[in-house]
Regions:
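Pocket-edge structural micro-motifs
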Residues: 30, 63, 91, 151-152
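Donor-binding and catalytic core of enzymes assembling or modifying cell-surface/extracellular glycoconjugates
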Residues: 40-133
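Nucleotide-sugar donor-binding patch of glycosyltransferase catalytic domains
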Residues: 75-76, 86-90, 121-169
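A short acidic, often aromatic-flanked loop/helix-cap motif at beta-alpha or helix-coil junctions
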Residues: 5, 95-98, 155-158
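Mid-sequence helix-capping/hinge segment at a functional interface
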Residues: 1-36, 75
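Histidine-centered active-site/metal-ligand motif
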Residues: 29, 118, 147
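Flexible, glycine-rich phosphate/dinucleotide-binding loops
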Residues: 35, 68-69, 96, 136-137, ...
Length: 169
């Protein structure tokens, strides 16, 4: 998969920093179509803060505008945990082609089981898939080499569709 040149140019302009400093970016998809498939926002925030202390790149939030409250929670937890990387928020502000171009420019996507995970695989951006709740990564991917899957080490994982996870990892 490749984005047309006009979208690649748009993505580079979107990700460019004031003062001409260009960051390396990781994309973060904190939402999911089902709350049971989503890692807790606080976990995202703390993980990103730890990551930012060892890496000088930026964090790009992607998703739909309906996920803005979740993103706000992640950013709040990120700042409380001492996160210091640059942040950009593209959630609700991209077309599909623009999202593909942004993902192609990122070094990594940290995500729940989502559609953008498969787009990132398509543009050869490495993925860390947080496979929680009723998600079975063997059925949903990410497919291909160079990606990582994190799933709770629980006897009951993955949960059934009708269950409410008592652990909600």
């Amino acid at each position: 998969v490749a984005a047309p040149a006009e979208y690649t140019d748009w993505a580079r302009r979107f990700l460019s920093s004031p003062g001409g400093l260009d960051h390396k970016w990781i994309a973060v998809q904190a939402g999911a179509s089902d709350v049971m498939k989503a890692w807790r926002p606080q976990h995202f925030g703390v993980t990103l803060a730890r990551f930012s202390k060892q890496w000088d790149g930026g964090i790009l939030f992607i998703g739909s505008s309906s996920e803005q409250d979740t993103i706000d929670e992640v950013i709040r937890a990120y700042r409380e945990a001492g996160g210091r990387s640059a942040i950009k928020n593209a959630a609700g502000h991209t077309t599909l082609a623009q999202l593909v171009a942004l993902l192609a420019d990122c070094r990594l996507l940290l995500t729940n089981d989502t559609g953008p995970m498969h787009l990132a695989v398509g543009v050869q951006t490495p993925v860390i898939d947080l496979s929680v709740g009723h998600v079975d990564f063997q059925e949903t991917g990410p497919y291909g080499p160079g990606h990582w899957v994190m799933q709770p080490d629980l006897e009951c994982a993955p949960c059934g569709f009708e269950q409410v996870c008592s652990h909600h990892a």
